[in-house]
Amino acid sequence: MRRAFYIGRFQPFHLGHYSLIKDIARDADEVVIGIGSAQKSHEPKNPFTAGERVMMIKHALEDAGIKHYAIPLEDLQRNAVWVSHIISMTPPFDVVYSNNPLVVRLFQESGILVEQPPMYQREGYSGSEIRKRMLRGEDWKSLVPAAVIDVIDEIDGVNRLKSVSKSDKDYRD
């Protein structure tokens, strides 16, 4: 059995992630998805909780029939032991998929095979672009799987993002 690992923040999970994971699933029997910065939520750059991101991924990939594990991973501020931390928190995997230079370097230095897949329309499909559109009231739903729209609607995610993006100076008299 071949198992692959892919990590991201998924704030939110979007069609770029979805497309890449579908490609990974063609080469692997199962995909271990690391939900990075799991401890962060209710911030402009990280509005969704780890549990909400698990739901987004589970429902989107369930619809595609992709066997996967979504594992929340808290940040570890010591790069020298980061790979060991990941390995201790996830099911075993044979290959890592990433284009993040630090992630690639750390796994390669640990002797783990790393594949660097092409990014899927990176300029349009990015969490920061989607969050920007949410804040501006522009279309963001075309950039995420339908299951993600359902989760964000269920948790009132757009209004949460708008609330946490305000500054206290917005309330001065």
UniProtKB/Swiss-Prot annotation:
GO biological process entries: NAD biosynthetic process
GO molecular function terms attached to this record: ATP binding; nicotinamide-nucleotide adenylyltransferase activity
Name listed for the protein in its UniProt record: Nicotinamide-nucleotide adenylyltransferase
GO CC terms in record: cytoplasm
Keyword Cytoplasm: yes
Lineage: Archaea, Methanobacteriati, Methanobacteriota, Stenosarchaea group, Methanomicrobia
Pfam families: CTP_transf_like (PF01467)
Organism per entry: Methanolobus tindarius
Enzyme class, UniProt record, top EC level: transferase
Domain of life: Archaea
Matching InterPro entries: Cyt_trans-like, NMN_Atrans_arc, Rossmann-like_a/b/a_fold
Enzyme Commission code: 2.7.7.1
Biological pathway: Cofactor biosynthesis; NAD(+) biosynthesis; NAD(+) from nicotinamide D-ribonucleotide: step 1/1
UniProt similarity note: Belongs to the archaeal NMN adenylyltransferase family.
Record field: catalytic activity: beta-nicotinamide D-ribonucleotide + ATP + H(+) = diphosphate + NAD(+)
Keywords, alphabetical: ATP-binding, Cytoplasm, NAD, Nucleotide-binding, Nucleotidyltransferase, Pyridine nucleotide biosynthesis, Transferase
NCBIfam families: arch_NMN_Atrans, cyt_tran_rel, PRK01153.1
Cystine bridges: none
